[in-house]
């Protein structure tokens, strides 16, 4: 999504009040989803932040059923509480079974958990046990 942060009038329930995916972001989501499908890789579960751009990414990736999870929300501008969000996410990590879970979230959340710096169109493989992170870019 182009820009920086979300507008002052941000509302989690109103996509028009949020920074959303542009054509490039939509194309990136579709391309990443297509590459994953082509590889034959499957996720046990797919979780998305409640922000509209993350939910749209989940839809455009077209990898199957997904659900929102507030533990992936952005705390960059204080729209979500950082400590609470990270507690929820770390607690969810403890519930993960065997297999791989796809998390669709924000740069600030990814960096806080993995220590990795990511840009638009990049994604991170993160091992919740070893705490190892690897950044990937499709192009």
Mark where each language-model region is.
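Active-site-proximal alpha-helix that buttresses catalytic centers in soluble enzyme cores
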Residues: 1-79, 116-139
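Generic detector of bulky aromatic hydrophobic side chains
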Residues: 15-16, 94, 107
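Beta-strand elements within well-structured catalytic alpha/beta cores of enzymes
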Residues: 47-48, 99-105, 109
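Short, surface-exposed amphipathic charged segments that create phosphate/polyanion-binding patches used
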Residues: 80-87
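Membrane-proximal amphipathic alpha-helices
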Residues: 90-91
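A short, structured loop/turn motif at beta-sheet edges
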Residues: 94-99, 128-130
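Short active-site-adjacent structural elements
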Residues: 111-113
